[in-house]
Amino acid sequence: MTFPVEKVRADFPILQREVNGLPLAYLDSAASAQKPNQVIDAESAFYRHGYAAVHRGIHTLSAQATESMENVRKQASRFINARSAEELVFVRGTTEGINLVANSWGTENIRAGDNIIISEMEHHANIVPWQMLCERKGAELRVIPLHPDGTLRLETLAALFDDRTRLLAITHVSNVLGTENPLPDMIALARQHGAKVLVDGAQAVMHHAVDVQALDCDFYVFSGHKLYGPTGIGILYVKEALLQEMPPWEGGGSMISTVSLTQGTTWAKAPWRFEAGTPNTGGIIGLGAAIDYVTSLGLDKIGDYEQMLMRYALEQLAQVPDITLYGPAQRLGVIAFNLGKHHAYDVGSFLDNYGIAVRTGHHCAMPLMAWYGVPAMCRASLAMYNTHEEVDRLVAGLTRIHRLLG
């Protein structure tokens, strides 16, 4: 069955607009995906007809809002096949989820002389929190290097582990190269050394199904806004036994059981003790609608369509004069490139004049830029609403830029 891309596009109102007098070709979904009417309408309806503060309210609106929020927690747990909805913490996004783990589990479990393993392809959100933790604790940060094709040098991984390795923190899919890392093999190796595993799933959950039980990771985190949902909301999954042992990171309302000026404070049970303050309830409702949307289309069908489009894009882009493509042949979601010796910002500005939106810069992956010896790259990302025609426009635009700039 053919993927209904035109029907999907009709659900995204922003795709009907023009930029610089030309139809918008939005090739920046890896930074943040556009939102379908179903998400916009669900969040709008909540604010119009159902808004109230959640938790402890005895009135109807509060009870309904609380129930709606907790239903999304259950829905998200099914989406990633968690064992229990109580293994999921609502966070602002992937970055906050990783910082929560670093400041809660990490503070409790990392000691001087311990080490944490990351890779050279990580987003800054999966580098900086571990650097800060290691500096605080006197621990060591170890790095898995890259092959020139943008895959990890896994033959070096075993040597990085030892009896002081406490955590492997690894991206599921690179936000620059599109490399999908072989998590089962990497997690199995971590288990041999008794290390925990955190997976940054920000660039994975929109492209194919994720099963955290099958992966057997300890932590998995992703953002709603890359999954066609609202900004400011994400999910942190933690194995239940581990989550129940973790101390809270932030203090405030909703995360307590009792508060006394003389007897101190006791915490709510997990996951609620990690959700201090008023939650982004509207964002949570929107996230639920986004999960409904991609589930109704079928992640397998989305993935098949995107892979077909990716193969076509790589074939066509390879024909552009003086282009350098970064990353492996088999990839998900993104194509990073440079055009001759022209700065990525200049190329991106020209493309914007043609109505084509791509991302330029270091993509929050400065160590990866340093490895390739470039200050920046252009990145085109492909989502379920992109088309062959938009790929053709990108190729034509780059060919024209090459002709104009030489």
Curated annotation (Swiss-Prot):
Entry-linked SUPFAM superfamilies:
PLP-dependent transferases (SSF53383)
Q: Which InterPro entries match?
A: Aminotrans_V_dom (IPR000192), Aminotrans_V_PyrdxlP_BS (IPR020578), Cys_dSase_SufS (IPR010970), PyrdxlP-dep_Trfase (IPR015424), PyrdxlP-dep_Trfase_major (IPR015421), PyrdxlP-dep_Trfase_small (IPR015422)
Q: Which UniProt keywords apply?
A: Cytoplasm, Lyase, Pyridoxal phosphate, Transferase
**Family indicated by similarity:** Belongs to the class-V pyridoxal-phosphate-dependent aminotransferase family. Csd subfamily.
Q: How does it assemble?
A: Homodimer. Interacts with SufE and the SufBCD complex composed of SufB, SufC and SufD. The interaction with SufE is required to mediate the direct transfer of the sulfur atom from the S-sulfanylcysteine.
> Function of this protein?
Cysteine desulfurases mobilize the sulfur from L-cysteine to yield L-alanine, an essential step in sulfur metabolism for biosynthesis of a variety of sulfur-containing biomolecules. Component of the suf operon, which is activated and required under specific conditions such as oxidative stress and iron limitation. Acts as a potent selenocysteine lyase in vitro, that mobilizes selenium from L-selenocysteine. Selenocysteine lyase activity is however unsure in vivo.
Entry protein name: Cysteine desulfurase
Organism the protein comes from: Salmonella typhimurium (strain LT2 / SGSC1412 / ATCC 700720)
